[in-house]
Regions:
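C-terminal cap of thioredoxin/glutaredoxin-like
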Residues: 1-9, 70-147
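Structural alpha/beta surface segment adjacent to cysteine/selenocysteine redox centers
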Residues: 1-74
Length: 147
């Protein structure tokens, strides 16, 4: 969720934003290779390239074929051949699987899911701004001894 990531950076004193892959392959059969492509972009292009790729993938959830993923990687200035090679060899499959296992272990069963001071917040919200305010308040409770 790009809106949550950008909001979290504005209150970094209260919280830390950590992204974990949790591709939902039932509704999105191409979600696993998309996550692997994003990890390839991150490994070769850094955090900014990863987030640019993430945002493109989020916007284009219905266009995640290998050729699409390679084109998106090129659009964020990643080397398309490197990403293609990583996808062909499944270079980042284990990384994505570790994230999924970690999520399952923590009770994650869908996206988006957030943890603030050990409490899970999941599902979709009709008012993202109110949800972000709720997360921020929960984060503050943890930093000021209130929770």
């Amino acid at each position: 969720m790009p809106c949550c990531r950008s909001s979290c950076t504005s209150w970094a004193d209260d919280a830390r934003f950590v992204f974990r892959n949790f591709p939902l392959t039932d509704p999105h059969p191409r979600a696993q290779p998309a996550a692997e492509a994003a990890e390839s972009v991150a490994a070769h292009g850094g955090e900014d390239a990863f987030w640019a790729m993430h945002d493109i993938l989020f916007t284009n959830q219905d266009a995640l074929e290998i050729d699409d993923l390679i084109a998106y990687a090129e659009a964020v200035a990643a080397d398309p051949q490197t990403v293609a090679d990583d996808l062909a060899t499944r270079a980042f499959a284990d990384r994505v699987r570790r994230d999924v296992r970690s999520g399952l272990h923590s009770g994650v069963d869908g996206t988006p899911t957030f943890f603030v001071n050990g409490r899970r917040y999941d599902g979709l919200w009709s008012d993202p701004a109110a949800f972000i305010d709720e997360l921020r308040a929960a984060a503050r409770q943890g930093t000021d001894g209130g929770g």
